[in-house]
């Protein structure tokens, strides 16, 4: 076995940047300077046992944000702490809770973490601090893995209960009478990783917390709420929406940090005509190997289990001669046994494991010690997640390196060519809508089961008597003579509500791989048609499953574990009809609108696409009924397509992959048609469009707008459906719709309406920055006709919608009028 002498991280980076093939792919290289610690003494009121416990661990003072947080909680304030990874947020809530227990052993605390693994890690950290402080504290996790005998002990004697929102919703709140010690004595509720509670999940969790606080009030307690979050654009607003409180924002970080190199890498274009790029996985391997050979602890993040396994296999093979035991390079993902995960985490902390390849399972705050390099094979989907993953390196006051390698997706390409999104603060905001009618009704049923509602009682936005009367018509609740509302059904409402979906009816996903089938998840009906149709490849906790059968009538999908090199994409034909307009304003080249829409969806066939290349390796039919989704949407109309005799159409779904394009009405271009191959989309009279060209332009521009919207709102692109209509029956103009893929919507479309100009300029910049010739999957989507320049057509349309161009044209016209004849 060959060995290499350890080299400094910066030395290895310098060598890498001297390699032309790697250096040329770097689109941006920033160095974030080292930061000195800002400290404060321990509060005078902090119990001496806790102070000694901290000092025994080498902690002789607090960082400034820790001191501010513990003082605020001690004064009875709700807080939200927003500081980077490895800045010591745990002490912000651990110290106030330990102090409360030191003063009153009958006190209780409830810790909420988004995942079981994180909860188990944090309870171990908290228990260790309690032992160091010579405090006998009963802290335990209460999750799906907790044995029944231990559950009973936690209910009666647990001083610190660590759980997740799903268990709180389904196993604690419905049985609150068994938890009366917790609800009577709870002094602090901790909500960690606040930024993960967004979208539908966050909307559900907000209602779970409404139920928690309702029961606390019933039992006579009024706990302080402590939230912690990664950097997002609206942490105080999100915390307020989740908790119904107005927390104090603590975001001045006092923790030290070493210098950090941040590199954005765009694999080179392999085919300018098709837009095919080098693999992000291959480039992740090329960047990781030199650091590993130099003895630098490195983590590589892949976006899916298959990506993790590919990178892991390649690294082990390449390093076999140099490192010997394969155990020094490990994988980490959902599906590993808890004991195996703990061993990997311990090996990383101790330095026995040199490299790890992980899904986002290691993104959250599980303690893995101090790493030197973090490499991301693909944009994780949000800026918050990006910094969480990059922050896995640099936990000591030493120089670290973070590398983000883009895939060919439009979102990745937008981020990689706009470094300001990562380096100049977060533009993205986590959005939830706790008052979404579907979500609110679901939790109102659960809350009524937990205890009766008084006449005029408020739950969320206001009194809920009318909503309870509606539920009463279903036969689930009844009103007594004194006006109180009681649960009257034999159903157990919490078991019928998934925190991960908003639809009132779901498809249960059953894993038939083991001897005893087990439920591994569920999904709403609208998503089920594309995620778990028969023969689909379904991903759960980074594990691939083949859907053997979707029983639509029984609402059950039967799956089994597989390991394949392809994924499935379902073509969804969508028709859309506006129902109501909430807001409508003039915009450059047309109008921007926010309103309610009815979306009808019909899934007809699926494709098998190879990972990495998206090569089509097969297809099959899908036989499922049409579904309707009533939701909210943002749309924009283009009102300058004069002289284009276009019949009204109902549109088709454009939400990703290959989409069905409207039937062409003109097979050949008319004589003398001007070329449309200039990069700026010029070359044709500004207001003259052929129907086919306009269809392509709307589709290309819409895909780019959808990608930019996902970046700005910090959502998965699949959360927003795309429909384009060459002539909308509603507006009688060419229209691009972005609708929320959630019944009733959760507020995303309203935000898009307000950020209309950013969407247009961002989409235009995304397409202009792409080096392809005529459109590709990284900007306007796959080229469906090699003879049509979709890139120039989309740019021509976006230029007509861009207020900057309108202002420039107006300025030029004014100048022309002022020139003497």
Per-region residue spans from a language model:
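Structured, non-catalytic alpha/beta "coupling" segments that mediate domain-domain communication
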Residues: 4-26, 541-550, 554-556
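Helicase motor core with emphasis on the C-terminal RecA-like subdomain
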Residues: 17-57, 61, 68, 74-75, ...
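Hydrophobic positions on the alpha1 helix immediately C-terminal to the Walker A/P-loop
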Residues: 92-93
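ASCE P-loop NTPase motor cores of helicases and related translocases
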Residues: 60, 102-106, 287, 764, ...
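Extended Lys/Arg-rich polyanion-binding regions
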Residues: 399-402, 408-422, 440-455, 464, ...
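Short cysteine clusters
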Residues: 770, 775-779
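N-terminal amphipathic/hydrophobic targeting modules at extreme N-termini
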Residues: 656-673, 683-685, 807-809, 813
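Short Fe-S-cluster ligation motifs
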Residues: 800-811, 821
């Amino acid at each position: 076995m060959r060995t290499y002498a350890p080299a400094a991280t910066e030395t290895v980076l310098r060598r890498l940047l001297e390699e032309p093939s790697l250096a040329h792919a770097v689109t941006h290289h920033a160095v974030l300077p080292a930061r000195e610690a800002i400290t404060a003494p321990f509060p005078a009121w902090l119990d001496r046992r806790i102070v000694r416990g901290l000092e025994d661990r080498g902690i002789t003072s607090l960082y400034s944000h820790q001191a501010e947080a513990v003082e605020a909680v001690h004064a009875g304030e709700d807080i939200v702490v927003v500081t980077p990874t490895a800045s010591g947020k745990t002490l912000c809530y651990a110290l106030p809770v330990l102090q409360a227990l030191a003063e009153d052993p009958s006190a209780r605390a409830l810790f909420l973490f988004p995942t079981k693994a994180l909860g188990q890690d944090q309870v171990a950290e908290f228990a260790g601090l309690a032992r160091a402080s010579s405090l006998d504290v009963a802290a335990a996790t209460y999750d799906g893995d907790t044995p029944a005998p231990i559950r009973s002990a936690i209910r009666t004697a647990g001083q610190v209960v660590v759980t997740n929102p799903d268990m709180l919703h389904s196993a604690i709140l419905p049985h609150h009478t068994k938890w009366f010690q917790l609800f009577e004595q709870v002094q602090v509720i901790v909500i960690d990783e606040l930024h993960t509670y967004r979208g539908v999940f966050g909307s559900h969790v907000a209602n779970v917390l409404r139920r928690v606080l309702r029961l606390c009030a019933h039992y006579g307690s009024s706990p302080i709420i402590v939230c912690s979050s990664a950097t997002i654009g609206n942490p105080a607003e999100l915390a307020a929406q989740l908790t119904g409180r107005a927390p104090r924002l603590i975001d001045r970080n006092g923790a030290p940090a070493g210098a950090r190199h941040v590199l954005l890498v765009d694999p080179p274009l392999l085919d300018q005509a098709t837009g095919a790029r080098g693999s992000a996985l291959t480039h992740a391997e090329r960047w990781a190997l030199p650091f590993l050979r130099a003895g630098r602890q490195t983590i590589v993040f892949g976006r899916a289990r298959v990506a993790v396994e590919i990178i892991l296999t390649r690294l082990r093979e390449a390093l076999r001669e140099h490192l010997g035991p394969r155990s020094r390079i490990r994988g980490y993902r959902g599906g590993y046994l808890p004991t195996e995960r703990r061993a990997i985490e311990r090996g990383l902390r101790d330095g026995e494991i040199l490299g790890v390849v992980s899904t986002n399972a290691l993104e959250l705050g599980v303690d893995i010690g101090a790493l030197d390099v973090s490499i991301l094979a693909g944009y994780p989907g949000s800026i918050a997640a990006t910094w969480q993953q990059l922050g896995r390196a640099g936990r000591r006051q030493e120089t670290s390196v973070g590398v983000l390698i883009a895939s060919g997706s439009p979102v990745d390409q937008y981020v990689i060519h706009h470094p300001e999104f990562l380096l100049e603060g977060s533009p993205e905001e986590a959005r939830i809508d706790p008052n979404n009618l579907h979500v609110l009704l679901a939790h109102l049923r659960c809350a009524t089961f937990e205890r009766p509602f008084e006449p005029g009682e408020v739950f969320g936005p206001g009194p809920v008597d009318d909503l309870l009367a509606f539920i009463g018509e279903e036969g689930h609740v009844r009103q007594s003579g004194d006006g109180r509302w009681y649960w009257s059904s034999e159903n157990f409402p919490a078991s019928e509500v998934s925190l991960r979906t908003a639809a009132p009816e779901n498809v249960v996903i059953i894993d038939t791989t083991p001897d005893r089938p087990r439920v591994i998840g569920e999904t709403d009906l609208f998503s089920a048609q594309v995620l778990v149709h028969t023969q689909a490849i379904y991903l759960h906790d980074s594990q691939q499953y083949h859907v053997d059968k979707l029983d639509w009538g029984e609402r059950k999908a039967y799956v089994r574990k597989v390991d394949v090199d392809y994924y499935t994409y379902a073509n969804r034909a969508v028709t859309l009809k506006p129902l109501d307009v909430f807001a409508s304003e003039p915009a450059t080249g047309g109008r921007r609108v926010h309103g309610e829409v009815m979306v009808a969806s019909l899934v007809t066939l699926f494709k098998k696409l190879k990972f990495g290349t998206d090569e089509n390796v097969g297809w099959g039919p899908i036989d499922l009924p049409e579904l309707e989704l009533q939701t909210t949407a943002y749309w924009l109309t283009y009102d300058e397509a004069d002289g284009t005799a276009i019949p009204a159409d109902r549109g088709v779904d454009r939400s990703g992959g290959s989409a069905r394009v409207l039937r062409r009405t003109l097979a050949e271009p008319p004589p003398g048609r001007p070329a449309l191959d200039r990069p700026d989309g010029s070359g044709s009279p500004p207001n003259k469009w052929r129907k086919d060209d306009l269809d392509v332009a709307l589709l290309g521009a819409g895909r780019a707008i959808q990608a930019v919207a996902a970046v700005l709102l910090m959502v998965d692109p699949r959360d927003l459906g795309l429909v384009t209509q060459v002539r909308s029956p509603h507006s009688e103009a060419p229209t691009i719709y972005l609708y929320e893929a959630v019944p009733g919507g959760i507020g995303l479309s309203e935000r898009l309406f307000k950020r209309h100009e950013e969407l247009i300029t961002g989409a235009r910049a995304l397409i202009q920055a792409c080096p392809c010739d005529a459109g590709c999957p990284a900007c306007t989507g796959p080229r469906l006709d090699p003879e049509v320049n979709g890139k120039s057509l989309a740019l021509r349309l976006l230029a007509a919608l861009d207020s900057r161009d309108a202002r420039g044209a107006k300025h030029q016209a004014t100048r022309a009028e002022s020139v003497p004849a």
